[in-house]
Amino acid sequence: MYQQKYLISSVSDSNQNGFSLHKNSFSYHFYSQMVSEGFGVILEISFSSRLVSSLEEKRIPKSQNLRSIHSIFPFLEDKLSHLNYVSDLLIPYPIHMEILVQILQCWIKDVPSLHLLRFIFHEYHNLNSLITSKKSIYVFSKRKKRFLWFLHNFYVYECEYIFLFLRKQSSYLRSISSGVFLERTHFYGKIEYLRVMSCNSFQRILWFLKDIFIHYVRYQGKAILVSKGTLILMNKWKFHFVNFWQFYFHFWFQPYRIRIKQLPNYSFSFMGYFSSVLKNPLVVRNQMLENSFLINTLTNKLDTIAPVIFLIRSLSKAQFCTVLGHPISKSIWTNLSDSDILDRFCRICRNLCRYHSGSSKKQVLYRIKYILRLSCARTLARKHKSTVRTFMRRLGSAFLEEFFFEEEQSLSLVFLQKIPFLLHGLNRERIWYLDIIRMNDLVDHS
């Protein structure tokens, strides 16, 4: 890091040195990205070493603290049916860069490194404000840089740390331990200060937020807080989040970004699904000797629906259909080969159907498949300067159907080896078949 300081001073002071780089040049952004990426790798190494040492000291298995996208939907399906209220919140952004520097100051004791961090923040601010039009510079500004992802994860960690601490202290149930995270010297300093000033204040806060049935789930910049408590308790948590972001991060957080809904009556949007809790009536006939009677029971069931309006809107922006959902040809792909066109359409169709395989209404998936299949046929017909009817008559409609349903047949065979149910029952079952490696770009996770 100290050797990089000479490069930064050379770039900023071009009159003293013969090494001058223009801020809009390719080399300038290349070196700026290399410095930031290297700085991010160094920070990740230091933070990961502290995390591993903390895990070894506390002897906590790492597997208990791993949470993936594959476990979110089964968790919601198992827990939401027994809870009452859900709080839908968006993590506020963007945060002022100087606040991040002050937060990292308790971790980084090297003063030149903090100055380097401020310089990198300043360069990113200038890069985002210029809106460059050159392709060489646009490549660096469009990439999801590792350093920015590290800062985002660290910011989210700071937001969730105090919440996890209060959640653990105010509950007698087993929860994710907050001690496995990185130690914070200034946080415990504040706790000691509060203990000296007022011994009962912290206990009052814990009693103020006490709830033994509360769950927190976050994916990217959106999170949900689900509880079995009352509406008053959810409003208390809302008040806590608003004041926390306002006084700790100096960020004015609008209260309307946290929406509290009652699960049996409303639905909420999370991870590309509209989720709600439905009442499922069940009638059971009970026979006791000569008397028989009926027992009516109500069970709660999590209902997840793929948002067809948002999916069609995404397909419309990608020029696969109109705003109303009418398929159109993809004109910019007509210069590709037939196999490449089919491969691109089928890959998009597979990703969408995989991600939304847990939808309770399969008609949405059938409509998306219809749009992509007909858009593919229109694109191929436009390339060969023919009509869709003539093109399909020449190749046969079974060709496209077999190509699109190849993934579904392979998926059915995989599950048939484990669960012996009929093929026609597969369409009615919800299978959370999520593929992180091939996550589609058309799903809006915000």
Curated annotation (Swiss-Prot):
Which PANTHER family does this one have? MATURASE K
**What's the protein called, per UniProt?**
Maturase K
* Role noted for this protein: Usually encoded in the trnK tRNA gene intron. Probably assists in splicing its own and other chloroplast group II introns.
Where does the UniProt annotation place the signal sequence?
Answer: none
Q: What is the lineage of its organism?
A: Eukaryota, Viridiplantae, Streptophyta, Embryophyta, Tracheophyta
Among InterPro entries, the record links this protein to: Domain_X, Maturase_MatK, Maturase_MatK_N
The entry assigns this protein to a family as follows: Belongs to the intron maturase 2 family. MatK subfamily.
Keyword annotations of the record: Chloroplast, mRNA processing, Plastid, RNA-binding, tRNA processing
Tell me the GO BP annotations in alphabetical order. Answer: mRNA processing; RNA splicing; tRNA processing
Entry GO terms, CC: chloroplast
Which GO-annotated molecular functions does the record name? RNA binding
The organism of origin for this protein: Phalaenopsis aphrodite subsp. formosana (Moth orchid)
Q: Which Pfam families match?
A: Intron_maturas2 (PF01348), MatK_N (PF01824)
The UniProt entry lists the main location of this chain as: plastid
Localization of this protein: Plastid, Chloroplast
Per the record, the gene is: matK
